[in-house]
Amino acid sequence: MLSKNVANGGLTASPFLLALTLSLGAAVSLGITRFAYGLLLPPMRADLGWTYTLAGSMNTSNALGYFVGALMTPWLMRRLNAASVMVIGALLASLFMGLSGFFTDSTMLLVQRWLAGVASAWVFITGGVLATRLGALDPSRSGLLIGLYYGGSGIGITLSALLVPTLLNQLGAAQKWHGYANWAWAWWALALLCVIASLVLIAPARAMRPLMTTSTSRESHHRQFRIADFGFALAGYTMFGVGYIGYMTFVIALLREQGASANQIMIFYALLGVACMASFRVWAGLLDRHKSGRALATLNVLLGVATILPALTSAWPVVLLSGIVFGGVFLSVVASTTALIRHNLSAHDWPAGISAFTVVFAAGQIIGPMIVGWIADSAAPVAGASDADGLARGLIFSAMALWLGALFASRQKALQQAP
């Protein structure tokens, strides 16, 4: 059974429990550090007088940091170990989140978002490596364990949804508390959540250190990682990065422009997070069955549908459906690439494979927010166009990027294993 304690690789704890606690790394690195900014974008833009292009560039800067962090992670893991890098990254991400509340200068905020991106890449990649190692202990349920880790981002999303709108509403948009705007206090509250989660991560990180020295000779029949072998999947994942981040950055701003109340936004974002947490159960079988790019392609198609819905209508049931489907799919796309690597590579090459996919993922995220922000701003000079019209056009672009990614991923074949 998955719930029983196992001794494989020196572990004495339940793989399920370890994956669950490791999921707090995904909560910190993506659920809060990356995605909570979408909740803070509207009040920060209103208070600081930003354009949508500048607002989008904050997540572009975060993605640039993530890109650099992804390049650094294999080097760090060779000198430390995945578990230590994860905890250090989580604590640093918490620090940089907190510092964001002290600045109003856009340059300084861009720097803080960049630093948080570097640290969050360390956390997310190393957590993915550890979750993949756990999956190797129970191959029949590896998709479940990997999906559980990535679904942890939903914990961060849900907590952010419950915390940020409530705090902003309590403090008021026009008033400052002890000299700081309401959004600054929201940054500090989110940083506190990250600190708590980071401290909880210490125990599972210690428990999993034996896995990082486990022999992988039994998997020597797998091929080594080569970029050319995964070209279509890497292209598909790049377009996923371009498309999904536009939604996560600007959908709250679109809902605000469409007249959604603070309570409606809280419900929408919380349901998105809950769906994300539940998604590991829904897609585990798909990830386990397919060794090709089929899972990545299927999930990108569904994600494109969820992304385009709020751009086509502001009907509340449809908007809620969009959030639930998006939350139930988007991090399973990430898990699908990890599963693809596990199916086709030896454990020795998992870190290299995960890092390569993370790099192209980050590259896509660098492009996405600025393009969507530019599209939203470019609608302003058009007669009769509103901010909502511009943001809707941006989400249509995001959906198209996701569908293009699905087309690429559908061409990815499973690798022929070495004898």
Residue map of PLM features:
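Extracytoplasmic gate region of multi-pass secondary transporters
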Residues: 37-38, 229-270, 274-277
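Cytoplasmic helix-loop-helix junction between adjacent transmembrane helices
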Residues: 112-152
